[in-house]
């Protein structure tokens, strides 16, 4: 924070926001990071990382807090900049911790308290002024699109270089994953060192049958020869049996004629 930001804000607000900044650096808010503008300590920007098991998972949501000169005796206004499916963009949000409800504001609440309350309301579905209704599918689409959207924001990139690098690494991993060819499943694959038997009773060593191709072809050819030989023998037995039967009948008839 520069000396210019100190001069522009009243002493009380400046001192309090400095304390809150040190506190949030020492004890970060889960899923959220925040930075004041170097030129104006009364304007803070934040980034919400979409929590797991929510439609916002994988998304990055940039917004800002505008503190009044009377802070902490008056509440700030809150805006969301990144399309998210929960709040309108660049619109003052009506929450109990914002300037819409000065009567419920507590001067003891810090920037950490404000951001925690914002995240809590974001993952809920209760309506309020500045909120919108969208499906979980739409929220997931916006979460995926938030990466590219935020990288186009100059203020976002200047205030959150670590988050920018995190997003770029995630994009790189996604690109590498999508460019990989789809692996085709291998039949009869077993773990290394194990021996199983696949089709035709062939042993499988380390997932493959040794010499399976030539051996299988030989078995198939032998089976064909065996079938032809069996059919020929069956026909021969029928012919021999019929000849024996004819000879027997002829012998019986001859014996009867002699008597």
UniProtKB/Swiss-Prot annotation:
SMART domains assigned: UBCc (SM00212)
Gene Ontology cellular component? endoplasmic reticulum; endoplasmic reticulum membrane; nucleus
Return the EC number: 2.3.2.23
The UniProt entry lists membrane topology as:
Single-pass type IV membrane protein
- Catalytic residues identified in the record: 94 (glycyl thioester intermediate)
Q: Which residues form the UBC core domain?
A: 12-162
- Which organism does this record belong to? Bos taurus (Bovine)
InterPro entries cross-referenced by the UniProt entry: Ub_conjugating_enzyme, UBQ-conjugat_E2_core, UBQ-conjugating_enzyme/RWD
Q: GO: which molecular function terms? A: ATP binding; ubiquitin conjugating enzyme activity
Per the entry, what this protein does is: Catalyzes the covalent attachment of ubiquitin to other proteins. Seems to function in the selective degradation of misfolded membrane proteins from the endoplasmic reticulum (ERAD). In cooperation with the GATOR2 complex, catalyzes 'Lys-6'-linked ubiquitination of NPRL2.
The highest taxon in the source lineage is: Eukaryota
**Is the keyword GTP-binding in the record?**
no
CDD domains in the record, alphabetically?
A: UBCc_UBE2J
* Stretches assigned to the Lumenal side: 248-259
Q: Which residues lie on this side of the membrane: Cytoplasmic?
A: 1-226
Q: What is this protein called?
A: Ubiquitin-conjugating enzyme E2 J2
**Pfam families linked:** UQ_con
Membrane-spanning residues: 227-247
| Localisation per UniProt entry | Endoplasmic reticulum membrane
UniProt-listed SUPFAM superfamilies: UBC-like (SSF54495)
Biological processes, Gene Ontology terms: ERAD pathway; protein K6-linked ubiquitination; protein polyubiquitination; response to unfolded protein
